Amino acid sequence: ALWELLQAGKLYGDVLTCTGRTMAENLTGAESHDREMIRPFADPLIDRAGFMVLSGNLFDFAILKTSVISEAFRARYLSRPGSEGVFEARAIVFDGSDDYHHRINDPALNIDEDCILVIRGSGVVGWPGSAEVVNMQPPDAMIRAGKQWLPTLGDGRQSGTSDSPSILNVSPESAVGGGLAWLRTGDMI
C-alpha cells in the first residue's frame, strides 16, 4: 500500500526514515502482486470514499468518517436550505468512556436528535494509546424508538466497523488544552 502511494506521488520518497534509508529505498521491491487486495491508487474500489480532514474553531484538524454518511443522515443533518452541508447541534459532553457509560441514559441530559455526542480525554495524551471510544450510541430510549445513531465528536479514535457518522482524532486534544476542553453540555456546535 505504501508503494502505491509513493508511485502516485503521495509520499515523499527522499525523506530519511528510522532505518537510516529513504522512504523510496525502504519501499524498493514492495509492489503488491495481488491487485484485488491492494488496489492501484489510480483504480480505487470506491471514488472519494472514507474520510475527510476538517478544521475549525474547536480544533486544528480532525477526521470526518464520510463513508457512513447515509442519505437519511444527509437529509436530517446536512440539508438545511441555504446551509447545505453544514449542521448545527447541541453538545452533550462526556469526560471519557466511563462518564459516557454512566450518564448516557440520564434523562436530565435531554438528549434528542438535535444533539451531538462529544467524548473528550480519549486522545493519545488523555488516554495513552488513544482509546477506541468515539463510537458512541444514543441513549437506550432513542434506540428503542428506532434511532440507531447520533453524530459524534471526540479526540480519541473509533473502530473501522462503526457505522456512526463521526468526527474523530480531534487535535489538539482536550488533555493538552484543545478546544474540546472548553466545550460544555448545551453549547451549540
Describe each region flagged by the PLM.
Residues 1-189:
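Catalytic or ion-coupling anion/metal-binding cores of large enzyme and transporter domains
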